[in-house]
Regions:
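Beta-sheet-rich sandwich/jelly-roll-like modules and their strand-loop junctions
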Residues: 1-48, 93-116
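Short linear sequence motifs
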Residues: 8-11, 66-70, 86, 103
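Terminal beta-strand-rich extracellular "head" domains
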Residues: 32-85
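Noncatalytic modules at the cell exterior or secretory-pathway interfaces
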Residues: 79-97
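Generic intrinsically disordered, low-complexity segments enriched for polar/acidic and small residues
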Residues: 12-15, 70-74, 80, 90, ...
Length: 116
């Protein structure tokens, strides 16, 4: 598949994963869906230099109850949310209910003095 949607972090990394240019952390992810997704888990997956793909197990997750459709919800990350320059990362989205069309914005905070 050449889309940005996948149920796995394996393969297709040129479409769904990216390399962070600086040390930093995941501050938050804002998600909006056309459906009431119910209890939803968003996770940060990462791997360091020398590993092709982000880890299939999230290093940290946040759960939010997305009870209303067409409404933005904030997933606020506070621990185990750091990454290092050159890491490959991915964000996972795991809703209880079918999400259908969903949009998300990821807010990363970089330390510009610690780059690749």
């Amino acid at each position: 598949s050449t889309t940005g949607e996948s149920s796995s972090t394996s393969g297709g990394n040129e479409w769904r994963h990216f390399v962070v240019p600086f040390d930093g952390y995941l501050d938050q992810v804002v998600v909006r869906s056309e459906e009431a997704c119910g209890s939803t888990i968003v996770g940060l997956h990462k791997s360091s230099t020398g590993t092709e793909l982000p880890n299939t197990t999230a290093s940290t997750t946040v759960t939010v109850d997305m009870t209303t459709d067409d409404t933005a919800y904030k997933f606020d990350f506070t621990s185990s949310n750091t990454f290092s320059a050159g890491d490959i990362i991915a964000i996972s989205f795991d809703p209880t209910n079918d999400a259908n069309d969903t949009n998300a914005t990821t807010i990363l905070v970089y330390d510009g003095s610690q780059g690749v």
